[in-house]
């Protein structure tokens, strides 16, 4: 079995994925890598909630998920976004299979705070055997970030943290967060490498702002001894070619690569 890469595609970038993105995934596969994709769908969920007039609110950056909101989240993530992304991958010659984190109990979840957040969960266990079976058969699993507990209750899971949990469970050699920019930018120039300390400073200095803040925080929290570096890359341009990654590499500390 070759190296396994987990790619997380945010909901806001899905409509902007370019042919270069799919070419990058193809390049990985040609190098013998296995690929797993975890996707979000925030903008689509927000639009559907508005269309259906289902009230919703955010608490500490997470969408409070009532039963009504959860029904829409499931419909959009698993019924629409997941299938669209799997279809796009197949159109580019990539053998994708769309699955929900609920399927086969792939993502076993537990509530973060039922009173404050409703059915928002965290990943308790990843049943990685399902992913290993799909990978061994040559498929690219495309996962919508829903989880299920032992009582059969479904939970809405943050896609960034779901991707980190999947990467840890399958022993991925790389985790890449796909955004609509080439990585962390300072004065328009790409920051090729960053550490936790540097990122803290870049946030304080207003270099890292808005939606990039939760991305880099998710990247930092995914770092471990088994996964010493994480990438932030663009879905609009080539991010992997001839064995080389293009984007910002995030590591825990400078000593790792000096």
Swiss-Prot record:
Pfam families: AA_kinase. InterPro entries: AceGlu_kinase-like_sf, AcgluKinase_fam, ArgB, Asp/Glu/Uridylate_kinase, Glu/AcGlu_kinase. One of its GO terms (biological process) is L-arginine biosynthetic process. It catalyses: N-acetyl-L-glutamate + ATP = N-acetyl-L-glutamyl 5-phosphate + ADP. The keyword ATP-binding applies. It comes from the Bacteria. It is an enzyme of class 2 (transferase). One of its GO terms (cellular component) is cytoplasm. Its EC number is 2.7.2.8. Keywords: Amino-acid biosynthesis, Arginine biosynthesis, ATP-binding, Cytoplasm, Kinase, Nucleotide-binding, Transferase. One of its GO terms (molecular function) is ATP binding. Catalyzes the ATP-dependent phosphorylation of N-acetyl-L-glutamate. PANTHER family: N-ACETYLGLUTAMATE SYNTHASE, N-ACETYLGLUTAMATE SYNTHASE, MITOCHONDRIAL. Homodimer. This is Acetylglutamate kinase. The gene is argB.
């Amino acid at each position: 079995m070759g190296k396994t890469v987990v790619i997380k595609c945010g909901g806001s970038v899905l409509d902007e994925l370019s042919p270069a993105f799919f070419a990058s995934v193809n390049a990985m596969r040609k190098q013998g890598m296995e690929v797993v994709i975890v996707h979000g769908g925030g903008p689509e969920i927000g639009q559907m909630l508005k269309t259906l007039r289902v009230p919703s609110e955010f608490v500490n950056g997470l969408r409070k998920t009532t039963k009504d909101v959860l029904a829409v989240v499931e419909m959009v993530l698993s019924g629409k976004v997941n299938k669209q992304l799997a279809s796009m991958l197949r159109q580019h010659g990539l053998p994708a299979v769309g699955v929900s984190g609920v399927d086969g109990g792939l993502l076993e979840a537990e509530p973060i705070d039922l009173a404050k957040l409703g059915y928002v969960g965290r990943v308790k266990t990843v049943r990685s055997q399902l992913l290993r079976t799909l990978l061994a058969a040559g498929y690219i699993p495309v996962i919508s970030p829903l989880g299920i507990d032992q009582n059969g209750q479904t939970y809405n899971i943050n896609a960034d943290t779901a991707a980190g949990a999947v990467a840890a469970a399958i022993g991925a050699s790389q985790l890449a967060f796909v955004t609509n920019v080439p990585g962390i930018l300072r004065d328009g120039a790409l920051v090729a490498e960053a550490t936790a300390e540097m990122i803290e400073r870049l946030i304080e200095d207003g270099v890292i702002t808005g939606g990039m803040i939760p991305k880099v925080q998710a990247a930092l929290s995914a770092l471990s001894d088994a996964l010493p570096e994480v990438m932030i890359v663009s879905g609009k341009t080539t991010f992997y070619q001839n064995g080389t990654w293009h984007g910002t590499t995030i590591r825990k500390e400078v000593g790792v690569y000096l």
